[in-house]
């Protein structure tokens, strides 16, 4: 990946790169394995930039060790820096001991090979295996670092059917805790702060269609919070009495583009209502 700036003030290369949100580790990688050019000539991070200088950096190639697997991808948005994919339910985001190959990360590795992109897989927001919907994927480590710093400003909206009748909209602010070696999370004061807003969309005889906005991104957050108020997701066997097939879907994302600074809002056309 290449980036270029036109310099306005006197400043050291290292300090300038830090001011652009590039981490010390990334600067070290650029210094050791990439390139730093000032007006087309190689320089070091200690070089003192002058007004009207042109600074160009080249990030070192990233070494992706994952096995490429040809799994169809539904790409909703793509540019030179990132893409947004619509992950189907049942597909793990990353390889695990139980699912070492058939994951979104393996599918992205295959896709990167097809477009000749030398990069590892950088997932900005991660969805559980059984959750479907929109995920942001940074194409480069630098883009991932920038987006993770602004993770709290990424708007994440979900939708699902929950058990029972919910009459009013609401907000759940309850800490979520994970016992060591246990998959299930619980509401516990020892846990991390978590906040979920929810809006009732449609009420049926035995369930309610609800939309959610997350202020935090804890694992199983919506499932834990809704179960805590007596309305687990329909089909959720971990937090309810279902058979393990629920329809939690990430249907909308909003974020500020890390390079262009434009506001990007992506909404899926499909509704599960």
Give residue spans per PLM region.
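RNA pseudouridine synthases
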Residues: 1-273
